[in-house]
Amino acid sequence: MATPLIRYLFLLCFTVCASIAMAQDGFGEETRIPEPVNPGLNYLLSLAEPVHSQNFDTGVIEEVIKFVLSSKDKTALYFPGNRTDIPSAYHEFDIHNGLKHVLDIGFNPNIPPFILSPSSIRLAYWKEINGKKQLLPDLSSMLSRLDQPITVTGVEHEEITPDLNTGAYYGYDLNRTLILLKYQGRPALISISKQKNISDIGKKGVVLGKDDNWDYFYSGQNGLNKPGLGWVNSYMYDSYTVSIFIERGGPGTLVHCGVFKWLRAGWADINMVQNQHIYRGLQRYTDTVKGILEYPSLPEPDKMAEIFSMIKTFSADELKEKVRNYITLLSQKYGDDASSGGKLITESIKDSTYLSQLSQYQMQSVLAVEYIKYLMGKNTIQDVAYFISPANINRHPKG
């Protein structure tokens, strides 16, 4: 058996090689975000703490908003320098739709919050809102009454999809704050999150085929899904995110989004994350969010919500049966492809305890993602027929 030192050197070599590969993969020069932006970022991050002032001060974040809206070197990798002990990155993008559409789909009390980012988030759900077990308020309906900023705080549980580099996936709780406001007459949403504690131990996952297929497998087994690294007990130690969505141009025509992300993760309290890793993850997130929010044929949000509500009515036994069908379809599609983790899927299908280890939320999320894949043209009516009848599909057609 390898000694701890040999294991550490092996893991360090793997991380360095991965970083070199990323450096050769089109990432530009790393550029620190201007110092005047830091006080505003620190202020926003403080709002994700369990105890903070409820009086939001727009003036403190002026420099943050200016930076988000400013023109930038498109070849540079920007990163905030306000926390020197943790890697970070910044990424921005445009959504060719209004903020109301963003809220209707991504921050809807009746639509799962991970639906905007199925390539990054396996599942997410609010454990509490404003100190109570309750639904997220209907933020979209509040856009017409933004005389004062509206603040929502709570605790959200999140589990991510397998990492593109290691195959690991993690679950953790977040303190999250949402602020809906008008900034210089423009409607804006600020989402702030801070990881509460160290994550669950990292588990082996698989990205099946191309990442934009949104096909992932979650083994439930501890470790990294990399040759020689299955023994690694990895964790996400810290993560913070500030996302700013602000309308630009004519009302309802375009939303500009800037995302600041900090992340520390690794093994034995040794951080293995670099700025490039975070930036690549933000690009992954961006591609999916834009693709969904700009897709021309989505049903109306209330029609989508009806299908998600139906999924919640399935009993535990019904969910297990439907997820069993899903895994069988995955096995048929990828089981012979060793590079896509077909062996891991086949082993799990033979394990009679596999379905029992899945939580209700995890099984519901499988069906929810399959539905959004159908809406986006990534699978067919036949692919979702095991949990949505043709009659239901016909009652909720694409737009």
Language model segments and positions:
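N-terminal secretory signal peptides that target proteins for export/translocation
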Residues: 1-6
